């Protein structure tokens, strides 16, 4: 086989493994060699939990978030709530003070999320640490579901599930219910058109993010079923206090570093989809790109904050870690030479020509997805502009999401190399 052809097939196999082969292999392993929790791991229980939230200038939503935590189905005497203010200049501390001794506060100068979490753990008095964000809300039974797997002594950390509220039907119902009291009634067809226009402005990226997130969650479920998932959901995860190690101040992904340290210590990190937190998907490609840049920059950072993760004799989940976290970082650098090689080789075989055409179609679909995003934003103003649910449009939105993710990986590396600040 000529060298160029060999390189083409090597790159094609690599990209296919990352996005298709690894998820399929995981699912097969789950079927053949599942590793269920010990039977007592599903037993009901209410161990003491310390809930820690690092917040900066979140005063506008802190009251709603604290109320959500106080209304969870969990005994008040087994629950400690700690809000760490990372240099807030708004009324965040005043909001927390209104709750008296029920909610504890820690005021720090600006130092970053990792330092704030370390300070919160220093105040924690219970055996289980629960980490959450100020923006998302927990389901009423989230805490009970999150702590249940810890009755299996092999479990060191548990990740909950982040539910993205981007479904058009559900959002239409919520928007329709948000009319101001006393406002005049609106004709159903007028209200429906108005609602559809607002939903249109959000549909392109929301749909792409939603599809990607469902794909990602299935990978996490399968990883968890055979051993450990690679990290946790930052909005809702828990770990044993005894396994906590202080985070370096510059840490970007506490929700990956802390759980993976549990894996290195010989414990499992499991995914519990009954422990749900709710959030909104990004409303445009720029916002989603910034989120992914932060996440992927954090994945690069992991490699030198905890280099033992790259050592197969130290990391019992080495194959999963390399396949899920490391290989994805390399995909953006495989795509350009793969396209160029298929172009050069396209005259030699229909296989290479088909590969070249397929890649061109992918990039064209991604470009069309970017156009759809602008079109959908215009639909919020133009009653004649309508978002399409046609299959080509859905494929375009997915292609745009994949392209955004890979571009964000490159931007994430640039952010790390230039020491840009990616957590605010």
Give short role names for the model-derived ranges.
Residues 18, 109, 115-116, 140-171, ...:
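Long helical/loop segments within the catalytic core of UDP-sugar-dependent glycosyltransferases
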Residues 43, 279, 328-420:
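Membrane-embedded multi-pass helical conduit in multi-pass membrane proteins
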Residues 60-64, 78, 89-98, 141:
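Acidic helix N-cap motif at the loop->helix transition within catalytic regions
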Residues 129:
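Short aromatic/hydrophobic "clamp" motif used to bind/position activated sugar donors
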Residues 150, 154-167, 202-216, 249-254, ...:
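Catalytic donor/gating beta->alpha subdomain of glycosyltransferases that bind UDP-sugars
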